[in-house]
Amino acid sequence: MSGQESGMRVLVVHSRYRSAMPSGENRVVDQESEALARAGHEVRRFEKKSDEIEHWSAMQKALLPARVVWSRESHRELAATLREYRPDVVHVHNTFPLVSAAVLYACRDASVPVVATIHNYRLMCASGNFVRQGAICHDCMGKLPVRGAVHGCYRGSRAATAPLVVATIAHRKAWRSLVSAYMFISAAQRDLHLALNLPSSRVFVRHNMIPYRDIQSAPRDPVVAYIGRLEEGKGLRLLMAAWDRYLGSSHDPGLRLVIAGAGSLDREVAAWASARPSVETLGIIPPDQVQGLMSRARAVLVPSVWEETFGLVVVEAMAAGTPTIAAGHGSLIELVTPGTDGALFQPSDPDALAGAVADVAAHPEKYESYGRRARETYEQRFNPNRSLEHLLEIYSFAITHPVSGRGALEQTLGQRP
């Protein structure tokens, strides 16, 4: 090991999500890598970009399902990178769709410890979010996810889901035996993964890092904001139903709803918003405009139907001194203290969300107070310096407590790669 005193040598592995879709995972990877480099550690990225898929040949696209299960290219390229770079630790983030679990075996063969941040539920659920047909579904938790293929849980397609199910089954033992430290981003997410029987001594909970930001002193507008992907699992249909109920309960709504983001519900949201003067849609906006919107809003809405693994936008809002109104389940109940720095509402209940929005309109001073306390929560619980220290502690654990993992591939596929 090169030693933490003189700086660790870290290799970050990540399959990047499409840039057309806002990705909290991409932001976390970038922010952590930058924080490590600023602290004097040597960081190299091993990344594949989903944006490249649209430029592939028809043959390459036809072979993508096989690559989801096992990417020979990633295995070969990472093995070469490990020989040349010789990192102290490899930090694996997302492996779907272009990296695959092949990278775990490459690290095993090079005797380099792996730290894995588990950002979603894909080790158990083909969709990655435990949502099927707009409702929470735990049918595959603790089991092989074959029901995901039956229901076509990924993008509503059995053909698209099948490679994910095969990959999960083929590499489940590898995920259990080739990782030296697992980082879950909330206790709620960790608890749902207990069904995998991961070695408890190697399991850590570490919230995502949010860079320190000076609070912007700007007057608050009569606005509540939604910032994120426009997807059913994120609660967009719930939000639209709740807003209509809020409008129906008041002749003078008093608030506007601003929606920033993109996703599969783009057209549906745009059509709905166009018929409502109180709603504005912005599409994807740059980070500085996101910060400006958060700083001006009276509250940020997080209506997620799925059980969020973390809720990055909640802590970003806290950093801006803005309270959050969030669905009361998953990790969100760990982040928001109702009556102190925000509010929680009954998940999947549009009337409950409408009532919370009406409360913002009726009691702006209360939400100003919540915002001040939200900033205090950010500084006390989500301090980025402490987050970096915790990350380095987990790296050190992985380096000093490596796993051999020998035999994982033989047990799983019957042969060495």
Language-model features, listed with the residues they occupy:
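Acidic donor-binding loop of glycosyltransferase active sites
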Residues: 295-309, 322
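Carbohydrate-associated surface elements
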Residues: 188, 209
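Nucleotide-activated donor-binding/catalytic signature segment of Leloir-type glycosyltransferases, i.e.
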Residues: 267-288, 292
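A short, well-ordered alpha-helix in the C-terminal region of glycosyltransferases
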Residues: 352, 359, 366-381, 387-393, ...
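Membrane-proximal helix-turn-helix segments that form the acceptor-binding/catalytic region
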Residues: 109, 138-182, 191
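Short glycine-rich donor-binding/catalytic loop of glycosyltransferases
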Residues: 305, 322, 326-333, 347-348
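Conserved donor-binding/catalytic core segment of Leloir-type glycosyltransferases
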Residues: 183, 208, 216-244, 258
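Conserved acidic donor-binding segment of nucleotide-sugar-dependent glycosyltransferases
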Residues: 338-339, 343-350, 359-364
